[in-house]
Amino acid sequence: MGRSLKKGPFVDGHLMKKVEALNATNDKKVVKTWSRRSTIFPDFIGHTFAVYDGRKHVPVYVSEDMVGHKLGEFAPTRTYKGHAADKKTRR
């Protein structure tokens, strides 16, 4: 279920301030963030965010197609290495 339209999209205030400061100076630094819950705004296009996945910061370059999604969608938290193979079938 999505967020109510009357509430509007959510973005952490500190993250928005950082992006606005980068846009004012036309700087393209990597923005390190733990805010996986923040919605991607059109102001974020062209910036790279280092989104924390619980272990490390994953670089996420924001493009036009990502607007409206959350930052956490592009930094997976779980690593799946597959099920254990049956030793009898490998011989």
Swiss-Prot record:
Coiled coil: none annotated. Keywords: Ribonucleoprotein, Ribosomal protein, RNA-binding, rRNA-binding. One of its GO terms (cellular component) is small ribosomal subunit. One of its GO terms (molecular function) is structural constituent of ribosome. Gene3D superfamilies: 30s Ribosomal Protein S19, Chain A (3.30.860.10). The keyword rRNA-binding applies. InterPro entries: Ribosomal_uS19, Ribosomal_uS19_bac-type, Ribosomal_uS19_CS, Ribosomal_uS19_SF. One of its GO terms (biological process) is ribosomal small subunit assembly. Belongs to the universal ribosomal protein uS19 family. Protein S19 forms a complex with S13 that binds strongly to the 16S ribosomal RNA. HAMAP family: Ribosomal_uS19. This is Small ribosomal subunit protein uS19.
